[in-house]
Swiss-Prot record:
This is Sex-determination protein fem-3. The keyword Lipid biosynthesis does not apply. One of its GO terms (biological process) is sex determination. It comes from Caenorhabditis elegans. The keyword Repeat applies. InterPro entries: BBS5/fem-3 (IPR030804).
Amino acid sequence: MEVDPGSDDVEADRETRAQKLKLKRNVKFRAQMRRFDEYCGVTNLTVDDLNWPLISGIPLQRQRLTGATYYDDSLLDQNPWDEFSIDRFLEITSIQLITAGAGYERNDEITRFVFQRTMKTIVTYCNFMYDLARRNGKVQITRFELQDLIHRDEFRFYMYFRQFLPNPDPNCTAFSNHYTSLLHTLYFNIPGMPQFWNNSQMYNYAATRGQRLVQNIAAFYPPEYFWNEDESKYHTTFVVPRGTEFSKFYARRFHEALGMPPLENEIITVLDWLAKLCILEIVYHTTIWCDITGFGGLPRIEHYRLAMENVEDIIFDLAIDDFSISRLQLQISPFEISRYSPLDVSGYYETIKRKKDIEEYQNRFYEVHYSDDVRIMNVYATDCSRKR
């Protein structure tokens, strides 16, 4: 039997390519870790907060979550990473706080506190899902662990069902069966769930929050806020920075800021959605805390810190540490009890128009914050086939 003398060269070339690929992955990993260290000054996260090992050369698997395509090259952002600043995430947080009724002008202290609390919460979710994935014999977070997390709250799972409804996938029957099983358990095993699911009263949970937050907007925001027809600010998130389309560049930066959790690629869009819900809940919880304590006005930074002092996870009730009042070392100033009154709008027709604008905004608040379709679903109306 003769051996092809060129076979040794082919094998050597294969080993050379493998070494180059490994070297490329190591260089990329070191760059990601360097950026994570830079982000830590703003996110207040450390490596000790992460349960997953930071190992070089473990790529994320390309698997579908919703029918959207995370690896759509036509939407690739060409921005170089070294031109990105983590302060951009603070700007996005500020936009979300304004639309949630926290205040018309940006407050850097409140923005930083809410952003750090949100990032800590999302990392806690990733730790929970990663530990669950390891118990299931997996090396990364999959959509199964994601649904087990969201299933802890029936209303949030319904929101997830509405916004991330997966398309039928004949190649992933296990996921379809798991998804259907969770829906079945949710529908039949929770008392009153059939009525909640099929009745318009299911919106009351979010409508109550929206109504209270709109009261702040109506009392303290200028009339020009209601006349602005640009609704992109309502859809602005960490991975949709312009409020119009999904950005792979920002999704990668958001993933790096979280400490690069090992997850299926498109789960980053759901984590971004959970981050938006977390910001809304923090604003609402602090507003209600101010109502109970008798403070009449927009919450200040000390109110946010005191309101969130004994609160763990604001959505799924997971344990979150390192946010105690002693660690923050607050300098609390005395509360200023000042009852607010409606804005003085001169002119009958201006008053009528303002009331109408506020009513229309309140009716739209639930839609843009809780039930509006995720913008990326319209962007990713593409073929979901993969090149494995």
